[in-house]
From Swiss-Prot:
GO terms for molecular function: phosphatidylinositol binding. Residues 1-60, 156-198 are annotated as: Disordered. It is found in: Cytoplasm; Golgi apparatus; Membrane. It is a peripheral membrane protein. This is Vacuolar protein sorting-associated protein vps5. Its main location: cytoplasm. Residues 170-181 have a biased composition (Low complexity). Pfam families: PX, Vps5. The PX domain binds phosphatidylinositol 3-phosphate which is necessary for peripheral membrane localization. Belongs to the sorting nexin family. It comes from Schizosaccharomyces pombe (strain 972 / ATCC 24843) (Fission yeast). Keywords: Cytoplasm, Golgi apparatus, Membrane, Phosphoprotein, Protein transport, Sporulation, Transport.
Length: 576
């Protein structure tokens, strides 16, 4: 720890004790018990954190190749220590959902075998914290749809008004039937959920990036190597495929559509200027590798068909990977029989107007989580903006030191007293050394705090995207409920007609049952997406805050070491 290796005289030193921010809340006298902390009263409104207006500056590119990396003293990097060691795994001890930033973190380190040397390409393996080791949350009962006439009345009544969500996201049908549903607190006490086991990531490596030049435009291709022993193959074998950046972006979009409410590990941002620089390509390669490993560690995403196809297929064609999801299948009318003179046109069109239903979040846990994400994103961007300004000023300071050293060196060449000329020459050499110290500090800031903040911001944006996909699923569900209501109206109207005019009755009954089953499936999937979103939010809070704390400590240690080195060099110069 920082306090042990630098401030040995004060064991209780804490560099973050006096700072109060969303990332470091003030401590309380009482420690949370192992049984969990009682939920706060919903009537008590916490004051929102102070926000700042953020304007994105131009990110300065630092040529890391010109810096003497052999002198870097980083103990860790934002993506993990640069080493040929094992990947750590997370086993959080939280026993309930904690969306806020005051989650207690105590990860347990694990290990996994090293990568196969066949495709290591003599590059260090970048370890990363498994941000998707899910924390247990209270069990939530999925409402059931009984196949009775009561369900028809329920869906008909639900079409006129949106369902009122409770903590357990109970559906409109279960509320209208008067079925008992547990709140979050009661449900957690009645059905305590067992902690899911932490999943080991697949052995994935992104390596050998090379630029493919074309007539119109060029792009970079990456080799993705995977060991198939995690896929229950009879024998261990390595599969290497070629993927470009657009393939990774398309994989992210597929996973987002296939799993509403799931927080997908974010993809690095697109860049137009300097995208073929060696430094930028290496940073993107490392970020893409971490993205794939975190997807493989997610208990839901690792078994996705599109993800397996991305790792194993020779070509990643959108036409091959496209599979109709439940939302897409509900967006088109179910026509399995002949046309019935437009009787179904009045309610099948409801599937194409999913945006007509206005979504209003009623779950207090998700409302608080959404507000926390908005505030957190603003504060993270503010800190990242300030860090970039600090880096820019340090680069200018290093340039000024270099100019001063050259001026003093030229002064030492003048025919002066020999002792004075020697002093000027030593001062000139000292300024050159101090310039390298400042440039090395710039590299350390980028590798530690800068990259971690940027990745954290992308994770927050991915979490907000999970809220959006869940909202689209809710709108599709409400459209299906309206379609069931209209189908029931048409069916009852046909039953009231004369026997000779009821030729379309069997077809209407069949279509009505299909629409009702589809509405039940959408209701169940919406409940599952809510549970998945809460679990991923808890895991995100635990893992990302832990990474940020580690990066801040590493950044502070590097700053102290840089100041010590500067003082030692000045003392050596004075002793000459």
């Amino acid at each position: 720890m920082l306090g042990h290796n630098i401030y040995e005289e004060d064991d209780a030193f804490n560099p973050f004790a006096d700072s109060v921010s969303p990332l470091n809340p003030p401590k309380t006298d009482q420690e949370p018990s192992a049984e969990g902390v009682e939920e706060e009263s919903p009537n008590v409104q916490a004051s929102p954190p102070k926000t700042h207006i953020y304007t994105s500056p131009r990110k300065r590119s630092v040529n890391l190749k010109s810096l003497p990396f052999e002198t870097l003293t980083l103990d860790s990097a934002p993506l993990g220590p640069l080493q040929f060691s094992d990947a750590p795994s997370m086993a959080p001890e939280n026993n309930r959902l904690e969306v806020g930033l005051n989650t207690k973190i105590n990860p347990l380190k694990g290990s996994s075998p090293a990568l196969n040397a066949d495709f290591s390409a003599n590059k260090p393996w970048i370890s990363e914290v498994n941000s998707f080791s899910p924390s247990p949350i209270g069990a939530t009962e999925n409402p059931t749809i009984p196949n009775s006439e009561q369900t028809v009345d329920t869906l008909d009544a639900a079409s006129s008004s949106a369902p009122n969500f409770t903590h357990t996201v109970s559906s409109a049908s279960s509320q209208k039937q008067g079925s008992t549903s547990l709140t979050d607190t009661e449900n957690q006490k009645a059905h305590p959920a067992a902690a899911p086991q932490s999943l080991t990531p697949f052995y994935i490596q992104v390596h050998d990036p090379h630029t493919v030049k074309e007539i119109t435009k060029s792009h970079t291709v990456y080799s993705v190597s995977t060991r198939l022993e995690e896929h229950n193959q009879p024998s261990v074998s390595n599969v290497t495929v070629q993927r470009r950046y657009n393939d990774f972006a398309f994989l992210y979009q597929l996973l987002s559509n296939n799993h509403p409410g799931c927080i997908i590990p974010p993809i690095p941002e697109k860049q137009v200027v300097g995208r073929f620089d060696d430094e930028f390509i290496e940073q993107r390669r490392a970020a893409l590798e971490v993205m794939l490993r975190k997807i493989s560690a997610h208990p839901v995403l690792r078994d996705d068909y599109s993800f397996k196809l991305f790792l194993e297929a020779e070509t990643f064609d959108p036409r091959m990977t496209h599979r109709t999801t439940l939302i897409e299948s509900s967006s088109s009318p179910l026509r399995s029989g002949p046309s019935t003179s437009g009787l179904l046109d009045s309610f099948t069109s409801a599937f194409h107007t999913s945006g007509s239903s206005k979504f209003s979040e009623q779950d207090p846990i998700l409302i608080e989580a959404k507000d926390t994400l908005d505030s957190l994103e603003t504060q993270l961007k503010s800190v990242y903006h300030a860090l970039l300004l600090s880096i820019d000023q340090r680069i200018q300071f290093a340039s000024a030191i270099h100019d001063f050293g050259e001026a003093v060196g030229n002064l030492s060449l003048v025919d002066l007293e020999p002792t004075l000329s020697s002093k000027f020459d030593g001062l000139s050499q000292l300024q050159v050394e101090l310039r390298f110290v400042q440039e090395r500090k710039v590299a350390q800031d980028n590798l530690t705090l800068g990259t971690t903040l940027e990745e954290y911001i992308r994770y927050v944006e991915s979490a907000k995207n999970a809220f959006t996909t869940r909202q689209k699923l809710w709108q599709t569900w409400q459209s299906s409920v309206q379609a069931v209501s209209r189908a029931k109206t048409q069916l009852e109207k046909c039953k009231k007609q004369a026997k000779s005019q009821q030729k379309s009755l069997p077809y209407l009954e069949e279509q009505y049952e299909k629409y009702r089953a589809k509405a039940a499936d959408l209701e169940k999937e919406f409940s599952e997406s809510t549970t998945l979103l809460k679990r991923d939010l808890s895991s995100l809070t635990t893992s990302r805050v832990d990474d940020l704390k580690a990066s801040v400590e590493t950044w502070l240690e590097s700053a102290i070491e840089s100041q010590k080195e500067i003082i030692e060099r000045w003392e050596s110069f004075l002793d000459q």
